[in-house]
Curated annotation (Swiss-Prot):
Keywords: Ribonucleoprotein, Ribosomal protein, RNA-binding, rRNA-binding
Record-stated family: Belongs to the eukaryotic ribosomal protein eL20 family.
InterPro entries assigned to the protein according to its UniProt record, in alphabetical order: Ribosomal_eL20 (IPR028877), Ribosomal_eL20_dom (IPR023573)
Gene field: rpl18a
UniProt-recorded name of the protein: Large ribosomal subunit protein eL20
Organism: Pyrobaculum aerophilum (strain ATCC 51768 / DSM 7523 / JCM 9630 / CIP 104966 / NBRC 100827 / IM2)
Any one GO cellular component localisation term in the record: ribonucleoprotein complex
Record has rRNA-binding as a keyword: yes
């Protein structure tokens, strides 16, 4: 079952960020953070610095998208 991770870091341009992402392991959360920040701001992995990855409970999540994804019991593909 996936967990909710809060990924905290900054970029070499000085932008600080906190992302809430789903992942099985902390490595998965870091990869998702690299993907999201890189695509949104056109940055490479060397320009993104991850400072901390913390597991948080669904009640502590502020992202509505993450809360919704955690509430899904099953997915049916047609």
């Amino acid at each position: 079952m996936p967990r909710i991770y809060k990924v905290i870091g900054e970029t070499t341009t000085g932008m600080k960020f906190k992302l809430e992402v789903l992942g099985e392991k902390p490595y998965d959360a870091i990869e998702k953070a690299y993907s999201l920040i890189g695509s949104r701001h056109k940055l490479s992995r060397t320009q993104i610095r991850i400072k901390d990855v913390v597991v948080i409970s669904p009640e502590d999540a502020s992202s509505e998208e993450v809360k919704l994804l955690m509430s899904i019991d099953k997915v049916i593909k047609y």
